[in-house]
Amino acid sequence: MEIEKTNRMNALFEFYAALLTDKQMNYIELYYADDYSLAEIAEEFGVSRQAVYDNIKRTEKILEDYEMKLHMYSDYIVRSQILEEIAEKYPKDSFLQEQIATLSSIDNRD
């Protein structure tokens, strides 16, 4: 469960990071992407572990709320699955394969 939550938070962060404050971005990135402990983050920012914990929990809720409203991550997953199914079903259709590659590159650009 913990790995699944970490993967989900990292994915939601990729989609919605620009909507977070700098502090929220820093805490979430350090905690989930860089695997810092609450104590390490607290020391880095000169705050209590409880303050870091509270901020991370609030930010997790914010990220989940964004996903509930905007569906960017879930739509990306569905879109990727559909493109994969089409690519597997029509492997010899070069035009279709090119279009799938184009759509995939749009989804995966920064």
UniProtKB/Swiss-Prot annotation:
Gene3D superfamilies given in the database record: Winged helix-like DNA-binding domain superfamily/Winged helix DNA-binding domain
Cited HAMAP family: UPF0122
Name of the featured protein: UPF0122 protein SGO_1122
Stretches assigned to coiled coil: none
Signal peptide feature range: none
Role description: Might take part in the signal recognition particle (SRP) pathway. This is inferred from the conservation of its genetic proximity to ftsY/ffh. May be a regulatory protein.
Similarity comment text for this entry: Belongs to the UPF0122 family.
